[in-house]
Swiss-Prot record:
It comes from Clostridium botulinum (strain Loch Maree / Type A3). Its EC number is 7.1.2.2. Belongs to the ATPase alpha/beta chains family. Coiled coil: none annotated. GO terms for molecular function: ATP binding; proton-transporting ATP synthase activity, rotational mechanism; proton-transporting ATPase activity, rotational mechanism. HAMAP family: ATP_synth_A_arch. This is V-type ATP synthase alpha chain. It catalyses: ATP + H2O + 4 H(+)(in) = ADP + phosphate + 5 H(+)(out). PROSITE patterns: ATPASE_ALPHA_BETA (PS00152). ATP binds at G233, P234, F235, G236, S237, G238, K239, T240.
Length: 592
C-alpha cells in the first residue's frame, strides 16, 4: 500500500503532530522518524495528524518522515499467546530480548506470534462441511491444559474445500473455504483491532459465581463469571496481592494479567511464582493458562493506554472459544493518567482534576466488553470474560474522578481500607463499605450447589458484623462494662468472624485458598459457636467461662485445616456441642 509520507511538524513528549497526512485515517498505526517508532493517530485536522507515540520520542526532530501503515492498532490472535509475556502493544518481550538485549530498543520490530514455531493442527470439520464465522474448524493443544480452538474469522462463511491434519506455523494455510466463487485461505492466526470489541451472538445473564478461594470475596462480595469488579485502595493496602490471589486461584480457564503502569517487581513476582504454583483443579503450573502483559511504570506512558485494550481483546478471543476468562488490570488509574497526559498535550478542555471529560465513557467502553456471551457460530458456545480493575486513588480518596467513574460502571466494589491494612488484617476489604450487586443472582446457585442455608448464614454473619460496628460506638462512649452479656457475646463472635474467617494469609500454603465447602463449614462453625453459647447464657452460664473454652482455639485454627482433612471441622462441631452440654448439666458457676 503506497501511501504518501508525512513530515513531523512538532513534538510534545509522547505527542507528535505531523503534516501531509491527508491519506491517513484516525486510529491508523504509523511509523515515526528514521527509527520507525510505533505510533497511533488519535486526532485528524485537515492534513495534520496528532500521533500518540508508544516509544520514547527523544531524538525526533521536525521534518522527520512519518509513514502510515493504513491499518489500525491490532493484535495477533492464535497459538502462542498462552505463557507469553508481551508489552503494551503486544510485542513479545522474550523475542525482543533475543533480538536487542535486556533493554527494549526503540523501533524494534518483532512479530507478536512466532512465525517459525510449528503447532499440531487436528481438524474437527471435514471437506464439504458448511461453516460460518466463529465455527471451530480444528484444535491445537497449546499447553497441557489449554486446547486452542481455531475458529473461522469474522466475515468468512462457505463450504470447506480442503482441510488437513499436520504441523503448521501460524501463517500456513490449514483449510480453504469456498463461498460462491470466492475461495478464502484459513490460517491459524487472526488479526483484530484492539479498540473494537469482538462480535458475539448475544449476551447472557451471568448467574454463576467466579470462585476465588478468598473467603471475604466468595462469601460476602462475590463476582459472577462475566461480571465486573474494582479494587480501589490507598498505597500499601494490598491491591496487587488481591489481584495476584485472583489470578492464581480464580476458577477461570484462562487468566490475562495486565501490569499497567505499576512496578516491574510485581510482574517479576508473577513470573517467579506462577510457574511453581499448581492449579488446584488440574495440578498443572498456573503459567500454563496465563497471558501476561507487562507495561510497567518505567515504560513509555502512552503505551499504558494501549495495554488495557490489548489485554481485553486477547481475553475476548479466548471467551469466543467458549472459555471462562478472568482479566486483571493493575492499575486502571495509571491508564487514566495516560489519558490525562495525552489530553493535556492535545490542549483539550480538562475535566475534574485535569482528567479528560470523556474519562467516564472510555472507562465504560472498557468494562462493557466484559460479560457472559453466546459466541458466534453454529455450535452455540458459551464464554465469559470477567474484568477486575485495580484503582489507585491518591491518598485513598475514593471521591477522585477515576474511582467515581469506575464505580458508576462496575457491579462489585471491594474497598480496601488502610486502617485494616495497618492492623495487619488482610485482605483489607472493608465489609461495611464494600458491596456486590450480583448477590441476588448468585444466591440461588449457592443454595443449590453449596448448601441450602448458605444465603441465610451469610445474612446472619453480615448483620453480626454490622451490629459490632454499632456496639463499638457505645463501647467508645461508655465502656464495655455498660454492655449486657449477650451484647458482649456478639462482639466476641464478630471478632471471631473477622479474625478467624475474613482474615486470610495469602502466603500460607493452606490458608491461601479455601474451597466453597470449607468456607461453608468454617462460617457455620463460627455461627454454631454463637448459637451454642447463647443457649448456655440462657441457662445461666457466665460469659467468661464460655470465652475461656479450649474449643475456641480449634475454631480459630480451622482455617489451617487442609482441603483433604476437611472432615476434621465436623469433629469441632461435635466437641463444641458436648462441651456446652457438660457446662449446662454442671450448672456453671452461677448455679454451683
Amino acid at each position: 500500500m503506497n501511501l504518501k509520507t508525512g513530515r513531523v511538524l512538532k513534538i510534545s513528549g509522547p505527542l507528535v503532530v505531523a503534516e501531509g497526512m491527508e491519506e491517513a485515517n484516525i486510529y491508523d498505526v504509523v511509523k515515526v522518524g528514521e527509527k520507525r517508532l510505533i505510533g497511533e493517530i488519535i486526532e485528524m485536522r485537515e492534513d495534520r495528524a496528532s500521533i500518540q507515540v508508544y516509544e520514547e520520542t527523544a531524538g525526533l526532530a521536525p521534518g522527520d518522515p512519518v509513514i502510515t501503515t493504513g491499518e489500525p492498532l491490532s493484535v495477533e490472535l492464535g497459538p502462542g499467546l498462552i505463557e507469553a509475556m508481551f508489552d503494551g502493544i503486544q510485542r513479545p518481550l522474550n523475542a525482543i530480548k533475543a533480538k536487542a538485549g535486556d533493554f527494549i530498543t526503540r523501533g524494534v520490530e518483532v512479530h507478536s506470534l512466532d512465525r517459525d514455531r510449528k503447532w499440531h493442527f487436528t481438524p474437527v470439520k471435514k471437506v464439504g462441511d458448511t461453516v460460518e464465522a466463529g465455527d471451530v474448524i480444528g484444535i491445537v493443544q497449546e499447553t497441557s491444559i489449554v486446547e486452542h480452538k481455531i475458529m473461522v474469522p469474522y466475515g468468512i462463511k462457505g463450504t470447506i474445500e480442503t482441510i488437513e491434519e499436520g504441523d503448521f506455523t501460524v501463517v500456513d494455510t490449514v483449510a480453504k473455504v469456498k463461498d460462491k466463487d470466492k475461495v478464502s485461505d484459513l490460517i491459524m492466526m487472526q488479526k483484530w483491532p484492539v479498540r473494537r470489541g469482538r462480535p458475539y451472538g448475544r449476551k447472557l445473564n451471568p448467574v454463576e459465581p467466579m470462585i476465588t478461594g478468598q473467603r471475604v470475596i466468595d462469601t460476602f462480595f462475590p463476582v459472577t463469571k462475566g461480571g465486573t469488579a474494582c479494587v480501589p485502595g490507598p498505597f500499601g493496602s494490598g491491591k496487587t496481592v488481591v489481584q495476584h490471589q485472583l489470578a492464581k486461584w480464580a476458577d477461570a480457564q484462562i487468566v490475562v494479567y495486565i501490569g499497567c503502569g505499576e512496578r516491574g517487581n510485581e510482574m517479576t513476582d508473577v513470573l517467579n511464582e506462577f510457574p511453581e504454583l499448581k492449579d488446584p483443579k488440574t495440578g498443572e503450573p498456573l503459567m500454563k493458562r496465563t497471558v501476561l502483559i507487562a507495561n510497567t511504570s518505567n515504560m513509555p506512558v502512552a503505551a499504558r493506554e494501549a495495554s488495557i485494550y490489548t489485554g481485553i481483546t486477547i481475553g475476548e478471543y479466548f471467551r469466543d472459544m467458549g472459555y471462562s476468562v478472568a482479566l486483571m488490570a493493575d492499575s486502571t488509574s495509571r491508564w487514566a493518567e495516560a489519558l490525562r497526559e495525552m489530553s493535556g498535550r492535545l490542549e483539550e478542555m480538562p475535566g475534574d482534576e485535569g482528567y479528560p471529560a470523556y474519562l467516564g465513557s472510555r472507562a465504560a467502553d472498557f468494562y462493557e466488553r466484559a460479560g457472559k456471551v453466546l459466541s458466534l457460530g453454529s455450535e452455540g458456545r458459551e464464554g465469559a470474560l470477567t474484568v477486575i480493575g485495580a484503582v489507585s486513588p491518591p491518598g485513598g480518596d475514593l471521591s477522585e474522578p477515576v474511582t467515581q467513574a469506575t464505580l458508576r460502571i462496575v457491579k462489585v466494589f471491594w474497598g480496601l481500607d488502610s486502617q485494616l491494612a495497618y492492623r495487619r488484617h488482610f485482605p483489607a476489604i472493608n465489609w461495611l463499605n464494600s458491596y456486590s450487586l450480583y448477590l441476588e443472582k448468585i444466591s440461588p446457585w449457592m443454595d443449590e450447589n453449596v448448601a441450602s442455608d448458605w444465603t441465610a448464614l451469610r445474612t446472619r454473619a453480615m448483620s453480626l458484623l454490622q451490629e459490632e460496628a454499632n456496639l463499638e460506638e457505645i463501647v467508645r462512649l461508655v465502656g464495655i462494662d455498660a454492655l449486657s452479656e449477650k451484647d458482649r457475646l456478639k462482639l466476641e463472635v464478630a471478632k471471631s468472624l473477622r479474625e478467624d474467617y475474613l482474615q486470610q494469609n495469602a502466603f500460607h500454603e493452606v490458608d491461601t485458598y479455601a474451597s466453597l465447602e470449607k468456607q461453608y463449614k468454617m462460617l457455620k462453625l463460627v455461627l454454631f459457636f454463637y448459637d451454642e453459647t447463647q443457649r448456655a447464657l440462657n441457662a445461666g452460664i457466665y460469659l467468661k467461662e464460655l470465652l475461656d473454652l479450649e474449643v475456641r482455639d480449634k475454631i480459630a485454627r480451622a482455617k489451617y485445616i487442609s482441603e483433604e482433612s476437611i472432615e476434621n471441622i465436623d469433629a469441632i462441631f461435635n466437641e463444641l456441642s458436648e462441651v456446652i452440654d457438660q457446662l449446662i448439666s454442671k450448672g456453671g458457676i452461677m448455679n454451683a
